[in-house]
Curated annotation (Swiss-Prot):
The gene is alh-9. It catalyses: an aldehyde + NAD(+) + H2O = a carboxylate + NADH + 2 H(+). GO terms for molecular function: aldehyde dehydrogenase (NAD+) activity. Its EC number is 1.2.1.3. This is Putative aldehyde dehydrogenase family 7 member A1 homolog. The record marks N185 as: Transition state stabilizer. NAD(+) binds at G264, S265, S266, E267, I268, G269. Keywords: NAD, Oxidoreductase. The lineage of its organism: Eukaryota, Metazoa, Ecdysozoa, Nematoda, Chromadorea. Homotetramer. PANTHER family: ALPHA-AMINOADIPIC SEMIALDEHYDE DEHYDROGENASE. SUPFAM superfamilies: ALDH-like. Pfam families: Aldedh. It comes from the Eukaryota.
Length: 531
């Protein structure tokens, strides 16, 4: 900028030129302004929109063009946000749960009104195709519906007391402030899972989104703000601080944050876990996944191939549940591989702009991801692997790569055991189901897995104590595409956290065991006499 000014260009002219380069000023992206976004956006909300950190730009992975400017928050902004969120909690926790559920229902309805626009923003800023972008927003809508019903069924158990004239029961209460640190690959849904359940269980929320997807976070927060204000609820209940690692560090180490929900890599998750545990805070970790599909000899191959393609190349291989290993019985290995290569070849012409309805594979999120893709392909080849399809970076604007199939590697090759966040599929052989299960379980993570079989004995072996060690254990469906009704999460270095359905709501509450003596006597437990 200084160089341009010194060349004689005025500051006003320079600002005009820079503004014209922003995608938000291109009529093609009119949905951005319909979501309330502008050229310059405050990345902090704590009841008011304000920020005092560095001004950054959000970029579109499809062409690496700047979308709009965002002024990040800093630690001082975070301090205001956490203070205001704590104040909002003090009122919200006393609102009856069904009323909280009604407000969450309205959030879902508000999201419905902007479903297409918000889905397009997710696609533009993250890089996933339009169908997946809209589907991600739909997940937030669905979890709002789920949480609304949950608001009338949050339950604690009543137990028989061994003492006469006594009642023994559980009482569940909100935790306080829930801190949500979300990842770039699901910039809307991960917050939605946490936000809906945290609100309905009586908590306030402070959201620190991924640094590369701030516009989605700002647009979502604007919609939530409208609902809270319309219901005379302190809008700081859902606070937002866009920023870098200093903001995340402040949140993780802050004793005022009762639960930290972190979605990201296992490496960073380990650090987050240690820091939160050091202050005896509560944790919800959703980390990496080196997921596998097992294809048994009796599998329906007409189901296997489309399921594998969806799970391996959907979101350009950037889901935590992406299939990265395909473990195929040696009797059907050649047949599966040939079908898979043909399927991949059909999609090559449909790699492109995620907002194009014909596109089925979008870009990687940034150039760093492209670099990791190239490094993993090179390592696979150096380790004796054969590139059956792909293995190349596409020479065009944006961060596009060919989805890749690799064969010929040992199942315990370092590159196979390591999660690469890109569309690289390692195809492996096995002879017995026990061998395949062992291969599935040998990686450090334990998120998602699937077995394709028509043998009911195999199904229950797979689901049992000597089967998959993952948190998600599927049969005859892909590893990705989980429904919101079940608990989502994994074991080992995936972190052990559970979000979304089932009893995941319990992680956002504290449990008290209450013994009530309604008699006029004072008997002690276990028949103890203390006289």
């Amino acid at each position: 900028m200084n160089r341009l000014l010194s060349s004689g260009m005025s500051a006003a002219t320079l600002q005009t030129r820079m503004a014209s380069q922003l995608l938000i000023n291109d009529s093609k992206y009119g949905f951005l302004k319909e979501l309330g976004l502008t050229e310059n956006n405050a990345g902090v909300f704590h009841g008011k929109w304000a920020a005092s950190g560095q001004v950054v730009q959000s970029f579109a992975p499809a062409n690496n063009s700047p979308i709009a400017n965002v002024q990040n928050g800093n630690v001082q902004d975070y301090e205001i946000a956490i203070s205001e969120a704590k104040k909002a909690y003090n009122d919200w926790c006393e609102v009856p749960a069904p009323r909280r559920g009604e407000i969450v229902r309205q959030i879902g309805d508000k999201l419905r009104t902007q479903l297409q626009n918000l889905g397009k923003l997710v696609s533009l800023e993250m890089g996933k195709i339009s169908a997946e972008g809209v589907g991600e927003v739909q997940e937030y809508v669905d979890i709002c519906d789920y949480a609304t019903g949950l608001s009338r069924s949050l339950e604690g158990k009543i137990f028989p007391s061994e003492r006469p004239g006594h009642a023994l029961l559980e009482q569940w209460n909100p935790l306080g402030v829930v801190g949500v640190i979300s990842a770039f690959n699901f910039p809307c849904a991960v917050y939605g899972w946490n936000n809906a359940l945290a609100l309905v269980t009586g908590n306030s929320v402070v959201w620190k989104p991924a640094p590369s997807t701030p516009l989605t976070a700002i647009a979502v927060t604007k919609l939530v703000e409208e609902v809270l204000v319309a219901n005379n609820v302190n809008p700081a209940l859902c606070s937002l601080v866009c920023g870098e690692g200093d903001v995340g560090q402040a949140l993780v180490k802050d004793k005022r944050v009762n639960l930290v929900s972190f979605t990201g890599s296992s490496e960073i998750g380990k650090i987050v876990g240690q820091q939160v545990q050091a202050r005896f805070g509560k944790l919800l970790l959703e980390l990496g996944g080196n997921n596998a599909i097992i294809v048994n000899e009796d599998a329906d191959l007409n189901m296997v191939v489309p399921a594998t393609v969806f799970a391996a190349v959907g979101t350009a291989g950037q889901r935590c549940t992406t299939t990265r290993r395909l473990i195929v019985h040696d009797k059907v290995y050649d047949q599966v591989l040939e079908r898979l290569k043909k399927a991949y070849a059909q999609f090559e012409s449909r790699i492109g702009c995620p907002l194009d309805s014909n596109t089925i594979i979008g870009p990687l999120h940034n150039q760093q991801a492209v670099g990791k893709y190239k490094a993993s392909v090179a390592e696979a080849v150096a380790s004796g692997g054969k590139i059956e399809y792909g293995g190349k970076v596409l020479e065009r604007d944006g961060n596009f790569v060919l989805p890749t199939i690799v064969t010929g590697l040992k199942h315990d090759s370092p590159v196979v055991l390591r999660e690469t966040f890109a569309p690289i599929l390692y195809v492996l052989k096995f002879s017995t189901l026990e061998e395949a299960i062992a291969i599935n379980n040998e990686v450090d993570q334990g998120l998602s897995s699937s077995l394709f079989t028509t043998n009911i004995q195999n199904v229950f072996k797979w689901m049992g104590p000597k089967g998959s060690d993952c948190g998600i254990v599927n049969v005859n469906i892909p590893t990705s595409g989980a429904e919101i009704g079940g608990a989502f999460g994994g074991e080992k270095e995936t972190g052990g956290g559970r979000e979304s359905g089932s009893d995941s709501w319990r992680q956002y509450m504290r449990r008290s065991t209450c013994t009530i003596n309604y008699s006029k006597e004072l008997p002690l437990a276990q028949g103890i006499k203390f006289e």
